[in-house]
């Protein structure tokens, strides 16, 4: 058990370092080029989100022992993402601020709320990456997310993957949703 815990800690620390280097590198390279007159309006990409989360490690056991919540290792997620971009250049990357409120386990008669705040970047090609705190009944952790937004007519359809390593195990999610493409 100790070897797994040490490996998971090194893996989590390495993933956080990589995510921070990518975010900082992308942010600093574009901030130098920005002029106030080049900045464009903010875009609201808030909308419903839904998907699934895999609960790894001892998360299922922790929920059972601490909260008397009995769920399978895979739970559905439903919720809302509030998203704003900070600023962007006409054809440059966008700095993002996202709050994601989800309720998991409804398919199993459980209520597992989570709140995640992500700060990240979306490229002109609609690829995005973000990192930030996550709070659930099982505790707090650091969430790392990446995804791509497809354009389907007047809709923006994001597909995001997130990994949340915690002391109880790793949660992995795939979420999608929609909002108006503005």
What do the predicted segments below correspond to?
Residues 72-78, 111-115, 136-142, 155, ...:
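Residues that define the transmembrane beta-barrel architecture of outer-membrane proteins
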């Amino acid at each position: 058990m100790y070897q797994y815990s040490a490996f998971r800690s090194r893996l989590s620390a390495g993933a956080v370092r990589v995510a921070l280097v990518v975010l900082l590198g992308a942010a600093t390279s574009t901030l130098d080029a920005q002029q106030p007159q080049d900045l464009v309006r903010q875009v609201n990409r808030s909308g419903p989100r839904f998907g699934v989360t895999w609960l790894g490690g001892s998360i299922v056991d922790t929920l059972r022992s601490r909260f008397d919540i009995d769920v399978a290792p895979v739970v559905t997620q439903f919720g809302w993402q509030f998203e704003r971009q900070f600023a962007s250049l006409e054809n440059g990357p966008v700095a993002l601020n996202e709050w994601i409120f989800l309720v998991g386990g409804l398919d199993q008669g459980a209520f597992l709320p989570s709140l995640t705040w992500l700060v990240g970047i979306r490229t002109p090609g609609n690829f995005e990456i973000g990192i930030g705190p996550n709070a659930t009944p099982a505790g707090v952790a650091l969430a790392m997310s990446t995804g791509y937004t497809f354009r389907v007519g007047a809709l923006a359809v994001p597909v995001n993957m997130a990994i949340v390593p915690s002391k109880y195990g790793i949660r992995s999610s795939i979420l999608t949703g929609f909002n108006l493409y503005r």
